[in-house]
């Protein structure tokens, strides 16, 4: 077998729990992105240099970050819609590039995490992309609602990577978006329509009182 196709060193689950699903793993080492069943056996793999974030779309295809870099260390051109045998049906290219996460909306449009590279910051914005045309329909810039560096913070926070958004989640009931901000040690929730900041969860240490 190809030495880039890695077997898990440890896996604990059952066929009753996992059923016909697989666990997809996208490594940051020189290894293939792969899917494993309950026994740890490889059921699927991809030879492209993919890092983020594989999700099964409602049509059965896969959504994942592309393998084409626009800025180091891992910001790529956008998101692929790919079939299980590797055929790329669409590439959604984002002007600021893609990182970490995407979310398929009920109507098929896609939330994609991005940034505005010319201003010198990363991982602090999100866009809504039309599934059929690739056009950007809405944008949420976290600099509109949050104080920028130095606020709160982890040890790896700096002015360039002040927020470090790792994930996005849409809640239909409240019509809102939830984002994680690793470098400010917070989770925030924003109104989908207006972008208004609804709430912040996190340690208030290091934050201005207002």
Where are the regions that the model predicts?
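Histidine-/acidic-rich catalytic cores in large beta-rich domains
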Residues: 1-210
